[in-house]
């Protein structure tokens, strides 16, 4: 378990979680804004899985962190776009490129 600060709010991140909500939601990760917890599923190598599970786990983590940021910013409760999985995925996948441009400007 790791702790991270999301806009000043402490979240606990659980890796290799066997939380039942993951299975119920058919999800590889979940963010619970009520308990301030992020759960990332346990991934196992098998013939049907992707080869680089470490990178995939990072993508799931980034996705869940974006959910937490949107919730803590208040955007999650104001409109549906902040809960839209495609928007969350886009930010999770593009955050390094965005940060790089910000770094060029500073």
Question: How does the language model describe each region?
Answer:
Residues 2-55, 68-72, 80-94:
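Active-site scaffold of zinc-dependent metalloenzymes
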Residues 56-64:
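Short alpha-helical catalytic segment bearing the HExxH-like zincin motif
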Residues 77:
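A glycine-rich, hydrophobic loop/mini-helix early in the fold
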Residues 95-100:
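Short, basic alpha-helical nucleic acid-contact segments in DNA-binding proteins
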Residues 103-106:
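Long, well-structured alpha-helical subdomains associated
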